[in-house]
Regions:
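Hydrophobic core of alpha-helical transmembrane segments in multi-pass integral membrane proteins
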Residues: 19-29, 94-105
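Membrane-helix interface/capping segments
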Residues: 66-79
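Alpha-helical transmembrane segments and their helix-start/interface "positive-inside/aromatic belt" motifs
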Residues: 3-21, 82-96
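A structural feature that tracks compact, well-ordered secondary-structure segments
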Residues: 31-33, 37-63, 70, 105-142, ...
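Sequence termini and other peripheral, non-core segments
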Residues: 1-10, 22, 26-29, 115-118, ...
Length: 149
């Protein structure tokens, strides 16, 4: 008698993004109670941006495409409309650019010397890094690395 293969649970299928989200919530809670003028408080502010960037990267590369980037999954072959194909093939870059622009607007309207203004500035930096990594991996190679083709 063959054993029926069970599909993985929701927690198992999403354990990476859930773990990253839990780390981010933990850092947000600690930062909200810390003194941003101390080394430790400043560290937590930077860590929020870094871990948010990792979480966004994991989730965005799961749902969006970027043709030629080692950081993106491959689109299904059944998309035939040119505009739709362009939007789909570059949806990862488009999504990161649009959400990054929203972070920039928020940053420009915030007090950069405030506790959360510094965090938003770090998030803008992390967003630029993620977008840069997606674009760079379209054209640059690293032997032995998935990201470099």
């Amino acid at each position: 008698m063959r054993k029926r293969k069970q599909s993985p649970s929701f927690l198992r299928e999403h354990s990476l993004s859930l773990t990253l989200a839990a780390i981010l919530v933990f850092l947000l809670l600690i930062y909200s109670r810390s003194d941003p003028s101390t080394h430790l408080g400043s560290f937590f502010g930077n860590a929020i941006a870094d871990w948010l960037g990792v979480l966004v990267f994991v989730i965005a590369s799961k749902y969006f495409f970027e043709i030629g980037s080692g950081e993106s999954r491959k689109p299904a072959r059944h998309f035939h409309v040119r505009v739709a194909r362009l939007l789909i093939n570059h949806s990862l870059t488009i999504a990161l650019a649009l959400t990054g622009a929203a972070w920039v607007v928020l940053y420009l309207r915030s007090d950069v010397s405030s506790r959360w203004g510094q965090v938003v500035g770090n998030i803008v930096s992390a967003w630029a890094q993620v977008l840069g990594l997606v674009i760079i991996t379209k054209y640059a190679w690293e032997i032995g690395s998935k990201e470099g083709h």
